[in-house]
Design a protein with these regions (language model features):
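N-terminal secretory signal peptides
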Residues: 1-32, 41-49
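Extracytoplasmic/periplasmic substrate-recognition and gating elements
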Residues: 87-88, 92, 315, 322-388
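Periplasmic solute-binding protein
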Residues: 133-137, 159-196, 222-252, 350-356, ...
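Conserved C-terminal helix/tail region of periplasmic/extracytoplasmic solute-binding proteins
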Residues: 8, 12, 18-21, 190, ...
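Extracytoplasmic "Venus flytrap"/periplasmic binding protein-like
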Residues: 85-155, 162-164, 187-198, 299-301, ...
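Hinge/lid segment of periplasmic solute-binding proteins
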Residues: 127-180, 204, 210, 231, ...
Length: 463
């Protein structure tokens, strides 16, 4: 490790080693390094010598890089929309953002962090991963990067709490999702005299009617690389809160009830009514496991329709409009609210959100994080569709069509709102849930074994 040569410096080598290790791991700015060194008791000259010994620059180039790296899961039309968000930032600042998309974000981030070549910024699909990375000291606290007064006026406290760890803000919630939406083609429903279901039993009855006509009522796909299974987890979470209510949901998330509890088993079984329904999904179960969630969303809107209903969050609208550019909202595509299972919890929804985190500390990162947090930046994607802003100052009128506006209104008016269960559980439990659901889709008779396996993981993870 780097050593100081000034005999007057009375700083422990352990403290210096920790600072150097943190610098090499996190890549914070020269200024931050100097400030932290001097806080340890080093003189300015000794701090500068130490910085040079670790490969730090003596000029401000590293503080103001003209190119930033950003890692995300967004590909296809989602990445196109994000590039549209970033374009004005590059025009205004001259800072280019190199975007890398991967379905295996967890694995790639782990490798990059170990190799000390982490991206400048990452966009994580859930706050659970943010909590894990913050605990590992792999993230930069945002309190000194953003105007906290502005952030507090733009974001509800609940979102800021979710983005915090040990009292510091580590994440800006950027793209939210209302996960209480079931997608369908109104024209097909009208021509076939199908009524949108209000209750779960109504939906099962409709599904059986469609299947009885030799058609497939549902499309479903859970393939997503190393995250395969998450769309099924969204199903289960949405069912659970509608079936057992918010208090039991919180106990489930906190592992105050075991995965073998009847409430959890019931939620899996209700999901199984769709996934394993007779003549419900073409080619099931193999097709469910092999089909990507984006491709599965197209079914109700193909001609002729390959299916009649598809469940996933309101970001599905972006998939539909990108694939079928001539379709008109409300006339050709729409959603109905997730059907009521228990009248006591009518209207309950789950939500998700993608979060912006900083993995290096420099002025360019600071500028991009500040920009992405603004209503103006988020409104760009809002107007393109398939995006729900977390910044509360984006007006509903900015949403491009009545379907998107209805989803936002549904989200703000929902009597019960819970964050997607897997997304706020420990990451190893989330992974166990995903893989367990894949096994359940393939082998429904193995449900008890699946739940016992997830419980074994949870028993260790929550200690």
């Amino acid at each position: 490790m780097a050593q100081t040569n000034d005999p007057q410096e009375q700083v422990s080598q352990e403290a210096i080693d920790e600072l150097v290790s943190d610098y090499q791991k996190r890549g914070f700015s020269r200024r931050s390094f100097i400030q932290r060194s001097m806080a340890l008791g080093l003189s300015l000259s000794a701090a500068s010598t130490l910085l040079a010994a670790c490969g730090g620059s003596s000029n401000s180039a590293n503080d103001n890089p003209k190119t930033l790296s950003l890692l995300t899961t967004w590909g296809g039309e989602e990445q196109d929309s994000f590039k549209a968000v970033v374009a004005p930032f590059t025009d205004q600042t001259g800072i280019k953002v190199n975007i890398t998309a991967t379905r295996d974000l967890d694995a790639q981030l782990t490798i990059q962090i170990r190799g000390k070549n982490q991206p400048d910024i990452a966009i994580l699909p859930n706050p659970g991963k943010m909590q894990q990375l913050a605990a590992q000291h792999s993230l930069i606290a945002l309190n000194d990067l953003v105007d906290m007064g502005k952030i507090q006026s733009d974001y509800a406290k609940s979102w800021l709490d979710l983005g915090s760890y040990n009292g510091k803000l580590y994440a800006i919630f950027f793209k939210a999702a209302n996960k209480g939406t079931v997608w369908y083609n109104p024209g097909q429903f009208k021509s076939n005299n199908y009524a949108t279901p209000a209750t779960w039993q109504d939906m099962i009855t409709l599904s059986n009617t469609i299947a009885g006509q030799g058609k497939f009522p549902w499309s479903m796909g859970v393939e997503s690389g190393s995250a395969s299974g998450w769309p099924a987890a969204d199903w289960v979470a949405q069912i659970f809160v509608n079936q057992s209510g918010p208090d039991m949901y919180d106990k489930w998330v906190a592992h105050q009830i075991p995965w073998t509890d009847a409430s959890v088993k019931n939620a899996f079984q209700f999901f199984g009514q769709i996934a394993h329904g007779q003549h419900y999904i073409k080619g099931a179960p193999a097709s469910i496991l092999a089909t990507g969630f984006t491709d599965a969303s197209y079914g109700p809107f193909q001609s002729p329709p390959a299916s009649y209903m598809f469940y996933l969050g309101d970001f599905t609208e972006g998939f539909i409009t990108a694939q079928f550019k001539s379709l008109k909202p409300e006339t050709d595509f729409n959603f109905f609210p997730f059907p009521t299972i228990n009248d006591s919890y009518k209207g309950a929804i789950t939500v998700g959100a993608d979060v912006v985190v900083a993995m290096r500390n420099n002025n360019s990162v600071k500028k991009l994080v500040q920009y992405l947090a603004t209503a103006d930046a988020q409104a760009i994607w809002v107007k393109r569709g398939g995006f729900t802003a977390v910044n509360k100052n984006v007006p509903v009128s900015d949403y491009p069509d009545p379907v998107a506006q209805a989803s936002v209104s549904m989200l703000t008016a929902a009597p019960i709102v819970k964050y997607g269960a897997g997304d706020v559980m420990p990451s190893q439990v989330q992974q166990a849930m995903w893989s367990g659901l894949l096994k359940f889709i393939q082998s429904p008779d193995q449900l008890d074994t699946v739940l016992s396996g997830i419980e074994s993981t949870a028993a260790t993870a929550y200690k």
